[in-house]
């Protein structure tokens, strides 16, 4: 006989896709008991007679999933680069665009000239698209300021945005995103600034949860990333890394060496990289939006990740240059159609494994007692439909921290 249990709200009348251990874990005709912001019981509604609820909601069918988690975005930036997209489709090369001082430097200029209020307002509009699809947790990176004052302003904008939206926002300092134009002849000096000036100030003001870098031949070398990681780890930051997107430099193994939460992109990760990630619990964050827009050919080694049991997350990588994507569900479909993931892996990739990539798997990402009450009610019969449909089928309800938003 179950012990009597009291809760604030009992949600029932739908199939619960728990995603415990990264599997669907479906409870048919299930129920979720919530007290305050937390789940205190999940199970079949037929077994809930012992629960005394102050409020009950019959969902009337459909499925319930954990709130979706977008674990890699660049939502805060100034300006717009749709003109470059059009130029490329009219035959203008990347090098020609760069010669016109376009590309990432165009975003850097626009971001540096934008006020904090302008950055927040623009990012909020982008973020609303993700939230409308059932996203309840979002990571947002800096990295378009590339000078101390502008990087701090970006992180302050992220913090301000977090206070204005019904979602959990995780901030990541990505000052090692590209070499600033002022340091193009001396990138080591910019690494000095990051390590000696910027990161200590970010830590002192509590502006970031993690530190990221871009390890690639057109950005920062493994040795330069190592310097950033040593400084960041000494200050208590969690670590993440853009690695193996365009070439194999051993960045994924470097991330694992430092016990980084994730290595992201990872198209060129080797078996030794994957083995290192498995040993250190580093999540592989796959970013099909950038792969698609750049028309890349090298797919991430999904079979190796499976074989070595490396958790695979999916994210939008929402950014103005290589992934202007504001739909996490589209990324789920791309993860399946472009990378060969299964629908179950894709859903795990935007719930439990995405939570792991943010160091939050003990609090969010699956529906079980003790976790935060973040969940989404969908007008669907099967979880695979979330991946199958391209657009449409918005949530019936989104519950964030126990409250319908």
Curated annotation (Swiss-Prot):
Pathway: Amino-acid degradation; L-histidine degradation into L-glutamate; N-formimidoyl-L-glutamate from L-histidine: step 3/3. N-formimidoyl-L-glutamate binds at residues 144, 319, 321. Fe(3+) binds at residues 72, 74, 242, 317. Its EC number is 3.5.2.7. It is found in: Cytoplasm. It catalyses: 4-imidazolone-5-propanoate + H2O = N-formimidoyl-L-glutamate. CDD domains: Imidazolone-5PH. Zn(2+) binds at residues 72, 74, 242, 317. SUPFAM superfamilies: Composite domain of metallo-dependent hydrolases (SSF51338), Metallo-dependent hydrolases (SSF51556). One of its GO terms (molecular function) is zinc ion binding. Transmembrane segments: none annotated. It comes from the Bacteria. Keywords: Cytoplasm, Histidine metabolism, Hydrolase, Iron, Metal-binding, Zinc. InterPro entries: Amidohydro-rel (IPR006680), HutI (IPR005920), Metal-dep_hydrolase_composite (IPR011059), Metal_Hydrolase (IPR032466). GO terms for cellular component: cytoplasm. Binds 1 zinc or iron ion per subunit. PANTHER family: IMIDAZOLONEPROPIONASE, IMIDAZOLONEPROPIONASE-RELATED. Belongs to the metallo-dependent hydrolases superfamily. HutI family. This is Imidazolonepropionase. The gene is hutI.
């Amino acid at each position: 006989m179950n012990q009597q249990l009291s809760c604030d709200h009992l949600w029932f009348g739908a199939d619960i896709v728990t995603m415990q251990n990264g599997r669907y874990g479906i409870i048919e005709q299930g129920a979720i008991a919530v007290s305050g912001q937390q789940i205190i019981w999940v199970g079949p509604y037929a077994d809930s007679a012992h629960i005394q609820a102050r409020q009950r909601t019959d969902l009337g069918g459909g499925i319930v999933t954990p709130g979706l988690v977008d674990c890699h975005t660049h939502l805060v930036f100034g300006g717009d680069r749709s003109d470059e997209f059009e130029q490329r489709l009219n035959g203008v090369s990347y090098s020609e665009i760069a010669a016109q001082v376009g590309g990432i430097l165009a975003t850097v200029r626009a971001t540096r000239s934008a006020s904090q209020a302008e950055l927040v307002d623009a990012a909020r509009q982008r973020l609303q698209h993700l939230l409308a699809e059932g996203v309840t947790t979002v990571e947002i990176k800096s990295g378009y300021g590339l000078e101390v004052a502008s990087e701090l302003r970006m992180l302050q904008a992220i913090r301000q945005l977090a206070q204005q939206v019904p979602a959990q926002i995780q901030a990541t300092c990505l000052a090692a995103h590209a070499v600033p134009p002022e340091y193009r002849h001396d990138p080591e000096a910019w690494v000095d600034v990051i390590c000696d000036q910027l990161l200590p100030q970010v830590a002192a003001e509590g502006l970031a949860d993690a530190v990221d870098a871009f390890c690639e031949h057109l950005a920062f070398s493994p040795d330069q990333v190592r310097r950033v990681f040593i400084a960041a780890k000494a200050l208590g930051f969690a670590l993440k890394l853009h690695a193996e997107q365009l070439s194999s430099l051993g960045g994924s193994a470097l991330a694992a060496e430092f016990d980084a939460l994730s290595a992201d992109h990872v198209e060129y990760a080797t078996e030794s990289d994957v083995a290192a990630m498995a040993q250190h619990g580093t999540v592989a964050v796959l970013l099909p939006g950038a792969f698609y827009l750049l028309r890349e050919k090298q797919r991430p080694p999904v079979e190796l990740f499976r074989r070595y049991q490396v958790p695979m997350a999916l994210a939008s990588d929402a950014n103005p240059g290589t992934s202007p994507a504001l739909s996490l569900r589209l990324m789920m479909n791309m993860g399946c159609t472009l990378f060969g993931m299964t629908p179950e892996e894709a859903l795990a990739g935007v719930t439990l494994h995405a939570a792991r990539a943010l160091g939050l798997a003990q609090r969010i990402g699956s529906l079980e007692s003790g976790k935060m009450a973040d969940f989404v009610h969908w007008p669907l019969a099967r979880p695979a439909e979330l991946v199958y449909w391209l657009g449409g089928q918005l949530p019936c309800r989104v519950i964030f921290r126990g409250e319908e938003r």
